[in-house]
């Protein structure tokens, strides 16, 4: 049953956009996929939680996290088969773990935590908070951006993840990301 949270084996390079809300992750995911002529994995939580908001006017609750994790991994595993040498992921289960802990007083479902730590990626692109925050139905922490960024960065450091921090405008971020991804592709 827990297999639905596990990555399928693959030889392609996997890159994750990682960071607080409204820091340009989706925009950069799309740009990188276009640049590398590959597919990108959207953030399943956005669709899931937008539907919940539209239907019930409710935001994320703890019982939503495992269905979100399952949907995210289903998308990633499906799109891995369609990717060409690199897969760009708008998020991963480690990000879901961070949000779980940030919103639910340090709590994270043990199943989510297990797979957040077991699933592997070649590079994390940590997006900084120097992009203006944009409101939508799901974003709710404009006053806590510095704290959230520190939490995301601390999580990558705690678990020894390979990451770089992206700051600046869209062009600068894209160029830095491409530079680091190319280094991995050329190894």
Locate the predicted segments by residue.
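Extreme N-terminal, non-catalytic leader segments
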Residues: 1-13
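Hydrophobic anchor at the beta1->P-loop junction of P-loop NTPases
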Residues: 17
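The conserved Walker
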Residues: 21
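Conserved lysine of the Walker
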Residues: 25
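Short amphipathic alpha-helices and their capping/turn segments at secondary-structure boundaries
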Residues: 29-35, 65-84, 108-121
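Conserved substrate/cofactor phosphate-moiety recognition/catalytic segment
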Residues: 30, 34-71
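Conserved nucleotide-sensing/catalytic segment adjacent to the nucleotide-binding pocket
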Residues: 56-93, 98, 102-103
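A glycine- and Lys/Arg-enriched "phosphate-lid" helix/loop adjacent to the NTP-binding pocket
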Residues: 103-169
């Amino acid at each position: 049953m827990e297999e639905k949270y596990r990555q399928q084996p693959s030889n392609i390079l996997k890159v994750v956009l990682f960071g607080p809300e409204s820091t340009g992750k989706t925009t950069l995911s799309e740009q990188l996929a276009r640049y590398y002529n590959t597919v990108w994995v959207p953030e399943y939580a956005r669709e899931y939680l937008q539907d919940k908001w539209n239907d019930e006017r409710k935001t994320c609750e703890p019982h939503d996290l495992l269905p979100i994790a399952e949907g995210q991994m289903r998308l990633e595993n499906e799109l891995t088969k369609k990717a060409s040498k690199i897969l760009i992921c708008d998020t991963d289960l480690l990000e879901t773990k961070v949000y779980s802990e940030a919103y639910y007083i340090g709590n994270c479902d043990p199943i989510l935590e297990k797979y957040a730590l077991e699933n592997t990626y070649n590079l994390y692109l940590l997006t900084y908070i120097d992009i203006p925050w944009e409101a939508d139905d799901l974003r709710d922490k404009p006053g806590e951006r510095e704290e959230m960024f520190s939490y995301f960065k601390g999580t990558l450091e705690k678990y020894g993840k390979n990451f770089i921090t992206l700051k600046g405008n869209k062009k600068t971020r894209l160029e830095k990301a491409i530079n680091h991804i190319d280094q991995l592709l050329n190894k």
